[in-house]
Amino acid sequence: MFIFSMGCVFNALVNIILKLLIQSPRPRESTRVFALEIMHNNRCGNSKIGYDRYGMPSGHAQQFLYMTVFIYFALRNSNITMFYLTVSLFVCIQRIVYNHHTIFQVIVGAIIGCIIGKMVYDYGNTQIIHLK
């Protein structure tokens, strides 16, 4: 459980770092206004630009697919995996339908989440083997 939780934190940090590096606007943003706000490091209303303003990669897709992949490898239970996969799919669709992310931003987030989920599971597995 500790490895899973630390993986969630690591996954979130990776997402924040990528958002700050890529600085891709969300689809509902006016590209011109977004560029001006970034240039002046200011939102309309004088609050600073935060990582949450950026859309690439989708943090929700990344986190949900991280959990799904980790749980798949940890439990190897098809019913639980299907439940998590269904919830993850609904979350990804919701992010697109509500215009919070483009399809590409969601796909990239999902891929990164899958990769980190497998990496964290493998790391946890090696730690358990070393304890024996």
Tell what function each PLM region has.
Residues 1-14, 106:
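Interfacial segments of alpha-helical transmembrane regions
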Residues 8, 12-29:
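Transmembrane alpha-helix/helix-exit interface in multi-pass inner-membrane proteins
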Residues 2, 19, 28-32, 106-108:
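Generic marker of "main functional regions" within proteins
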Residues 5-6, 29-34, 46:
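Acidic, polar low-complexity intrinsically disordered regions
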Residues 34-132:
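Membrane-embedded catalytic cores of phosphoryl/pyrophosphoryl-handling enzymes
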